[in-house]
Amino acid sequence: MAAKVFESIGKFGLGLAVAGGVVNSALYNVDAGHRAVIFDRFRGVQDTVVGEGTHFLIPWVQKPIIFDCRSRPRNIPVITGSKDLQNVNITLRILFRPVTAQLPRIFTSIGEDYDERVLPSITTEILKSVVARFDAGELITQRELVSRQVSEDLTERAATFGLILDDVSLTHLTFGKEFTEAVEMKQVAQQEAERARFIVEKAEQQKKAAVISAEGDSKAAELIANSLATAGDGLIELRKLEAAEDIAYQLSRSRNITYLPSGQSVLLQLPQ
């Protein structure tokens, strides 16, 4: 009797385990920010896109393919040529995500690794097309315009594959060794030219100052000559007297100086 009871319990437990396994295999979860596409062994990829949450499927017949629909970054380096045939190394940073409604088409025509298959090729295509419109100098001075043109063209191109580009930016832009050396030499030459121009301007200013000073000396000499011609020796004597008075005044301000007037035998001690 007990053996039959245990046998019944065993069968019930086995049946419960099988039923639990079946139920568990019929459930699947779609996490936040993700979507699922159902592949049916008999009908192929279903057009319905499954949202977040827990869902049922037919075990061994249907299979969920989970896609991450959040924006993800990707850096893509590209080597291309400018309008003036200079080698340009560019790195493009892209924030991308799939169009949710087009996930069945993306999975059918491209696959789960759609970003690996699509983004590098279309990025290289667009960058080569846009960069070829500018020469090396314009790529530096008009970088914002280049970035905007690349973003517009690449966004339009990605849309044909069911991708949305939330942001496109140029994060790295360098040129070949020859062009870099040429730019550095040009900058040095410009600095030398500025320095030479400063020296020339300084010399010109000094020359003008010398001319003005010479003209002033010439004018002063002319005035003195005219004064001498008009006043004769009287002007010279007057200047001598003024000079003597100035000397006497300076001597009188000095300590321990004795002044002896002309024509007198008495020494006078000037006040301190």
UniProtKB/Swiss-Prot annotation:
* One GO BP: mitochondrion organization
Sorted alphabetically, which Pfam families does this protein's record hold? Band_7 (PF01145)
Does the keyword field hold tRNA processing? no
Where along the sequence do coiled-coil regions lie? 177-211
Record carries keyword Nucleus: yes
Intracellular or extracellular location(s): Mitochondrion inner membrane; Nucleus; Cytoplasm; Cell membrane
Its cellular-component GO annotations read: cell surface; cytoplasm; mitochondrial inner membrane; mitochondrial prohibitin complex; mitochondrion; nucleus; plasma membrane
| Keywords, comma-separated and alphabetical | Cell membrane, Coiled coil, Cytoplasm, DNA synthesis, Membrane, Mitochondrion, Mitochondrion inner membrane, Nucleus
Subunit-level organization: The mitochondrial prohibitin complex consists of two subunits (PHB1 and PHB2), assembled into a membrane-associated ring-shaped supercomplex of approximately 1 mDa.
Q: What does this protein do?
A: Protein with pleiotropic attributes mediated in a cell-compartment- and tissue-specific manner, which include the plasma membrane-associated cell signaling functions, mitochondrial chaperone, and transcriptional co-regulator of transcription factors in the nucleus.
- Give the similarity note: Belongs to the prohibitin family.
Q: What is the protein's name according to its record?
A: Prohibitin 1
Report the gene name. Answer: PHB1
